[in-house]
């Protein structure tokens, strides 16, 4: 199989990280990302190394029997989610298979090495679970109107305005729509990755699941020619704070970033409203979080994770560590 070969195959499994193994009618195996076991797919080989071919997904010809869920309206174009058409329990089964294969490849099977596999602990919430999003400014097609959202699958430049994203709650969607409406009406240009010209870059939104506190950080360049920045930012603050939210605003921030890299980099932050931080709670502990804090993006899922670790430490004797301190030394905010 050579580079440029166009073929079809059926995905027999998906290995970590997101590598579908498609089998052709001739029995050849090709790695095709962003696929689901059971799908019949069309691909184009774009890499051959050590007799292993990797292909780019061109089209899903037949759905997998696993695909029984109605996806988010942006699914397919948006590059953020892969398995939304698969029921959550089946997603956990896929993860279990991948994790066990990784462990077996490293140390052998449970029988060979004697380890105990306790399974996959799922998230209490299956939708609207994220407490953080980084939206990008751009356009959905070349020279199109302003967009705010996620990158299209497989595209470095084009975006999808994810105004109905299902992995965040309505407050996130309201903030996205208010921001896009405001800057569109004011004809403010986004930072173009090719020309390195423009003002708008990213919108960071965080909301605490337990406390309901919200913080928003608008990331821009310092290219303010033709822009009354003070007036513009005052209008942005007003556009956000006059909408209805289930949570409550703790802060509106403005961060400057003139780096050419397409990453959120803090080169100076000012507070437009409120505070530069908010609080979230996990297992009775309170955490102070800023826009740039490392923190688990699924608060309720994080509680499951930490509670499991706590059970390992305590065992059957929960009173033995009463009043003692456990240090989590690789935990970001924690």
Task: List each language-model region with its residue ranges.
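Accessory RNA-recognition modules of RNA-modification enzymes
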Residues: 1-334
């Amino acid at each position: 199989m050579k580079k440029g070969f166009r073929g079809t195959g059926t995905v027999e499994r998906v290995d970590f990280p997101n590598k579908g193994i498609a089998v052709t009618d001739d029995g050849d195996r090709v790695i095709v990302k962003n696929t689901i076991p059971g799908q019949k797919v069309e691909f184009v080989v774009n890499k051959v190394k050590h007799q292993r071919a990797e292909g780019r997904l061109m089209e899903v010809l037949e759905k997998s029997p696993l695909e029984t869920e109605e996806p988010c309206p942006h699914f397919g174009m948006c590059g953020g989610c892969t398995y939304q058409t698969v029921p959550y329990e089946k997603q956990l089964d896929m993860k279990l298979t991948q994790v066990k294969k990784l462990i077996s490849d490293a140390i052998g099977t449970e029988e060979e090495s004697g380890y105990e596999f306790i399974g996959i602990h799922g998230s209490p919430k299956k939708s609207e679970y994220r407490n953080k999003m980084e939206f990008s400014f751009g356009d959905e097609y070349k020279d199109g109107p302003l967009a705010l959202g996620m990158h299209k699958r497989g595209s470095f430049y084009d975006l999808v305005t994810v105004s109905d994203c299902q992995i965040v709650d309505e407050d996130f969607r309201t903030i996205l729509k208010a921001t896009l409406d405001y800057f569109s009406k004011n004809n403010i240009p986004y930072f173009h990755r090719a020309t390195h010209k423009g003002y708008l870059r990213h919108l960071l939104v965080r909301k605490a699941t337990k406390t309901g506190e919200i913080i928003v950080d608008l990331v821009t360049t310092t290219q303010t020619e033709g822009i009354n920045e003070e007036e513009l930012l005052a209008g942005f603050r007003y556009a956000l704070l006059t909408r209805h939210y289930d949570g409550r605003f703790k802060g509106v921030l403005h961060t400057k970033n003139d780096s050419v890299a397409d990453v959120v980099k803090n080169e100076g932050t000012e507070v437009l409203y409120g505070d530069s931080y908010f609080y979230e709670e996990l297992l009775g502990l309170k955490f102070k979080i800023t826009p740039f804090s490392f923190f688990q993006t699924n608060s309720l899922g994080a509680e499951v994770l930490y509670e499991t670790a706590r059970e390992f430490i305590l065992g059957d004797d929960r009173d033995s560590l009463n009043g003692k301190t456990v240090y989590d030394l690789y935990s970001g905010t924690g």
